[in-house]
Amino acid sequence: MFEIHPVKKVSVVIPVYNEQESLPELIRRTTAACESLGKEYEILLIDDGSSDNSAHMLVEASQAEGSHIVSILLNRNYGQHSAIMAGFSHVTGDLIITLDADLQNPPEEIPRLVAKADEGYDVVGTVRQNRQDSWFRKTASKMINRLIQRTTGKAMGDYGCMLRAYRRHIVDAMLHCHERSTFIPILANIFARRAIEIPVHHAEREFGESKYSFMRLINLMYGLVTCLTTTPLRMLSLLGSIIAIGGFSIAVLLVILRLTFGPQWAAEGVFMLFAVLFTFIGAQFIGMGLLGEYIGRIYTDVRARPRYFVQQVIRPSSKENE
């Protein structure tokens, strides 16, 4: 049996991108939830290159008297997961909770995650109940969840919900991973010995609009497939074998038909030959596109560029920037 260490300090990591309308309420509610824990805590807000007034508001929040807020300002937009990784690199707590800034997942759920982590779990995930998203977002989320479960073999119910708790050793393990394409919930589950999911409330978005457009969801799906598993390459090899066998069978059939019915029939079969040809060409292009995705990610990783660049870090203990 492994010794269960009680949580002493909680770090809440929240990526922020153009959320100036929700920030005051986010800070108030998150601070209140953390105060109710009766433990040490810090709230890390990472500005992911916002074009509105979010960065300035974060700096002011960190410099306020009695603040527990650490503001991390990135020089441009790197994406949600890169921003969270930037926050992970500055946490000091032994339990790290991630939360979205849109308040669709209430900060009031934080004490429940801490209590469950205190039972000895490495990762505490969440499943959104009564989701208040559009039909398209719900459908896309279900498809992505099923895709992840099949390709990774990790049976988690809601990978899209970022309200999660991670023990410090899980976060440290993730920080040692250097791939550019990172999907934090899956990466954490790879290192977790004990993981669990709990149901949480899901509210309507009150401020702003979702940052995930249709194309960003498509890009996310491609990224998940190509960065998490080589199964599509194996499926591509299998598909190529099936097509090759099918093509050979059709060729044999065409020879037999020509010998049976003569050259006149062969002339009338030109369109079928074109159809078969276009089928093979289409399959080749699909395969080349998939290989291109993998090669592109290999190229990106080989360059070894940083995931993000931190421009400033403002801690509540000092008004000086790091």
UniProtKB/Swiss-Prot annotation:
- Asked if the keyword Transferase belongs to this entry, the reply reads yes
Q: Which domain of life is it from?
A: Bacteria
What EC number(s) does its UniProt record assign? 2.4.2.53
Q: Which Pfam families match?
A: Glycos_transf_2
**What span is annotated as the signal peptide, if there is one?**
none
**Function as written in the Swiss-Prot or TrEMBL entry:** Catalyzes the transfer of 4-deoxy-4-formamido-L-arabinose from UDP to undecaprenyl phosphate. The modified arabinose is attached to lipid A and is required for resistance to polymyxin and cationic antimicrobial peptides.
* Name of the protein: Undecaprenyl-phosphate 4-deoxy-4-formamido-L-arabinose transferase
Q: Which organism is it from?
A: Escherichia coli O127:H6 (strain E2348/69 / EPEC)
Q: What lineage, starting at the top, does this entry show?
A: Bacteria, Pseudomonadati, Pseudomonadota, Gammaproteobacteria, Enterobacterales
